[in-house]
Amino acid sequence: MATADLSSGPKLNSSSTIARRTTDLPLLVAQIASFSGLMAAGTTILRIPAPPPLFEITLAPVFYLAISVLFPRRVSFWSTALGSAIGEAINVVVYGGFPIYVAGIVWARAPEALIIYKFRNGSTRMLIISMVLATIYETFAFFFPDWLFYSLALFSYSDVPQGFAGGFALAFSDLFTMVDLVWIPVAIGAVVAVRKAFRTRFLD
C-alpha cells in the first residue's frame, strides 16, 4: 500500500499543475489581449506631437514599463510584442513606411519587458534603474540596425549605400528615443498607485 501511495503522489501533483495552468489560461489570454490593445493604442493614437527630429512622443512606454513590473513575464512580454507590432503595422499602413518597421519595434521594445521584469523584486530605485537600462537598450536597438541599413542600403532604407559615415548621420535621430526616459516617473507613479489600490506588490 505504501508503494501505491508513493507512486500516485507525483501523478496527483502533475494533474493539479495541469488543471491550474488550464484554469489560468483564459486569464492569461485576456490580459495579453487587453494590454496588447492598450499598447497598440499607445503606439498609434495616444501620442504627443513634437518638433523635429522627434516628430512625436508616444505614450506606449508608460504602459509597458508599468506592466512589466506588475504582471507576470509572459503577460508583459507578449502584450508588449503583439501590441507594438499591431500599432506599428497600423502606422505603416496609414502613414507610410516599410514593413520592417514592425519587426524593428518588436525587437526594440519586447526585450525591455524582460529587462524590467528581472529587477521587479527590487526597490523603487532598482525599478527606476531597470527602466533606464531598458530605454537605453531600446534606443540602441533602433540605432545600430538603422545605421547598418542606411550604410548598406538594406530593406529599401536608401536607394544607394550611404557608407558608414552617411549611415550614422541618417540614423542619428534614433538616439532621441532616449526621450522616453521622461515617462519613467509616470510609470513609477502608476506602479505605486496600483500597489496601494490593490494592497499587493504584483498582480500575478
Summary of predicted features, one role per range:
Residues M1-D204:
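Loop-helix junctions at membrane interfaces
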